[in-house]
Amino acid sequence: MAESELQLVAQRIRSFPDFPIPGVLFRDISPLLKDPASFRASIRLLASHLKSTHGGKIDYIAGLDSRGFLFGPSLAQELGLGCVLIRKRGKLPGPTVSASYALEYGKAELEIQKDALEPGQKVVVVDDLLATGGTMCAACELLGQLQAEVVECVSLVELTSLKGREKLGSVPFFSLLQYE
């Protein structure tokens, strides 16, 4: 990984204590999105990892609603791939499949269009941040319903203390930046 590019990305992540509730340290990617050089570096670094790990053996990038949409299409473009969207319930037209996941106070659902992928296609799931792993795990379940193969999940930021990586089980996971 190009250390100077990684430093450029890391410098554009800000921390806000006690947001959105007391005791939470929020990692804000807004400065990264505002700076074209940093954003470009984040995409290049993720793409470089995927190329070296999987070569040309990825068919699609799947972006998670909503901030995965910021990275998914750009990453797909960098790799010369298409991007499919995994949305929150009720946001996609046509036939869909869904998977639910737990939130702190209740549950939520993700959906993907039934015709988004063919069985056996190889997919990388991307989001901005991995916390508890609930959303990413639900995305993997959805892709499994379509008989797609999740070859890896990636994110810009990983909050290691929340152990989301463990929830993914045997699915490989990669993040550019790790914080407690």
Swiss-Prot record:
It comes from the Eukaryota. Pathway: Purine metabolism; AMP biosynthesis via salvage pathway; AMP from adenine: step 1/1. The modification Phosphotyrosine is found at Y60. The modification N6-acetyllysine is found at K114. Its EC number is 2.4.2.7. It is an enzyme of class 2 (transferase). The modification Phosphothreonine is found at T135. Pfam families: Pribosyltran (PF00156). One of its GO terms (molecular function) is AMP binding. It catalyses: AMP + diphosphate = 5-phospho-alpha-D-ribose 1-diphosphate + adenine. One of its GO terms (cellular component) is cytosol. Belongs to the purine/pyrimidine phosphoribosyltransferase family. HAMAP family: Aden_phosphoribosyltr. Homodimer. Catalyzes a salvage reaction resulting in the formation of AMP, that is energically less costly than de novo synthesis. This is Adenine phosphoribosyltransferase. It comes from Cricetulus griseus (Chinese hamster).
